[in-house]
Curated annotation (Swiss-Prot):
SUPFAM superfamilies the record matches: Multidrug resistance efflux transporter EmrE
Protein name: Solute carrier family 35 member F6
Coarse class of the protein's main subcellular location: mitochondrion
InterPro entries, per database record: SLC35_F1/F2/F6, UCP036436
EamA domain location: 104-160
Keywords associated with the record: Glycoprotein, Lysosome, Membrane, Mitochondrion, Phosphoprotein, Signal, Transmembrane, Transmembrane helix, Transport
Pfam families: SLC35F (PF06027)
GO biological process: negative regulation of mitochondrial outer membrane permeabilization involved in apoptotic signaling pathway; positive regulation of cell population proliferation
Subcellular location: Mitochondrion; Lysosome membrane
Subunit structure, as described in the record: Interacts with SLC25A5.
Entry comment describing in which tissues the protein is expressed: Expressed in pancreatic ductal adenocarcinoma (PDAC) (at protein level). Strongly expressed in prostate and thyroid. Weakly expressed in lung, heart, liver and kidney.
């Protein structure tokens, strides 16, 4: 069945906005500008402020939900039910996980390459699978266990590529290792978030845009308030601002004033996460969760290719091998081999229900992509 123009538009929107989301965050990190009080030129390293911006983008999904609800007010068959019972506090625990995981990933993005950042996020499969067995009572089939093992192997190869790559003065080997480990740690938290959402949220049949928007609201408010104590908490060498504190939002705004292109990068990050979530949800609804997963894998290729073209990182053949192994692991875990085996076995009907399964991130993406 050929795709309609609308489906092609959604697929393109998801691919483009998902790529912009990671690349714009890395672009902002690469800028150098003076800070407040005439401080010397330094890198724009404000991961927690960037996380606040990401949650602002997710929060905008709530506005999109209410617009859809107003438009569908007179439609009895609409999926946006005005009378749907809803307790926003259900989203507080997942939002706290989202806030922690997102902040860790933005910190890690300052330390490692955009392509490694995107590839290592595939580790979420490992922890989601293990946690779903432990806390949701789910039984994984052989192909899912093989997918987890392949994902572990892929992560090792990608990490090895980072170790063997040439490192400039901006990204020392110790920083790259720390950044990669932070990304893995963040995926543990993201996996906890997904398990919490499945156990306590999905059974209430909350509209995905409302779910994303509500978590964005909690994350935006809580992390914005935390910026105040972060301004005073010393962080030593871990800090990227002149004052040596955990976060210096005032320094960030001064840098934006000195270099307006930083604002362009931040706006790109904020707007892209909103459109990416909308496009991802729509792709799952209009096409399938499998299609969404394939597009997310293509996004990694786009990010890697553009990072090479822009000179942000050096080419390393091991990254290709690592990405292919990660792709195989993701495909095995999510059952993409079943349609292929169905076609190979003559006359055997394809299992269409596998297309409709909610895969990892099937209803939302936690960082930049997600998630």
């Amino acid at each position: 069945m050929a795709w309609t123009k609308y489906q092609l538009f959604l697929a393109g929107l998801m691919l483009v906005t998902g790529s912009i989301n990671t690349l714009s965050a890395k672009w902002a990190d690469n800028f150098m500008a003076e800070g407040c009080g005439g401080s010397k030129e330094h890198s724009f390293q404000h991961p927690f402020l960037q996380a606040v911006g990401m949650f602002l983008g997710e929060f905008s999904c709530l506005a999109a939900f209410y617009l859809l609800r107003c438009r569908a007010a007179g439609q009895s068959d609409s999926s946006v039910d005005p009378q749907q019972p809803f307790n926003p506090l259900l989203f507080l625990p997942p939002a706290l996980c989202d806030m922690t995981g997102t902040s860790l990933m933005y910190v890690a993005l300052n330390m490692t390459s955009a392509s490694s950042f995107q590839m290592l996020r595939g580790a979420v499969i490992i922890f989601t699978g293990l946690f779903s067995v432990a806390f949701l009572g789910r039984r994984l089939v052989l192909s899912q266990w093989l997918g987890i093992l392949a994902t572990i192997a892929g992560l090792v190869v990608v990490g090895l590529a980072d170790l063997l790559s040439k490192h400039d003065s901006q990204h020392k080997l110790s920083e790259v290792i720390t950044g990669d480990l932070l990304i893995i740690m963040a995926q543990i938290i993201v996996a906890i978030q997904m398990v919490l959402e499945e156990k306590f949220v999905y059974k209430h049949n909350v509209h995905p845009l409302r779910a994303v928007g509500t978590e964005g609201l909690f994350g935006f408010v809580i992390l914005s308030l935390l910026l105040v104590p972060m301004y005073y908490i010393p962080a030593g060498s871990f800090s990227g601002n002149p004052r040596g504190t955990l976060e210096d939002a005032l320094d960030a705004f001064c840098q934006v004033g000195q270099q307006p292109l930083i604002a362009v990068a931040l706006l790109g990050n904020i707007s892209s996460i909103a459109f990416f979530n909308f496009a991802g949800i729509s792709v799952t609804k209009e096409l399938s969760a499998t299609t969404r997963m394939v597009l997310d894998s293509l996004r990694t290729v786009v990010i890697w290719a553009l990072s090479l073209a822009l000179g942000w990182e050096a080419f390393h053949a091991l990254q290709i091998l690592g990405f292919l192994i990660l792709l195989i692991g993701t495909a095995l875990y999510n059952g993409l081999h079943r349609p292929l085996l169905g076609r190979l076995s003559r006359g055997r009907p394809l299992a269409e229900e596998s297309e409709q399964e909610r895969l990892l991130g099937g209803t939302r993406t936690p960082i930049n992509d997600a998630s």
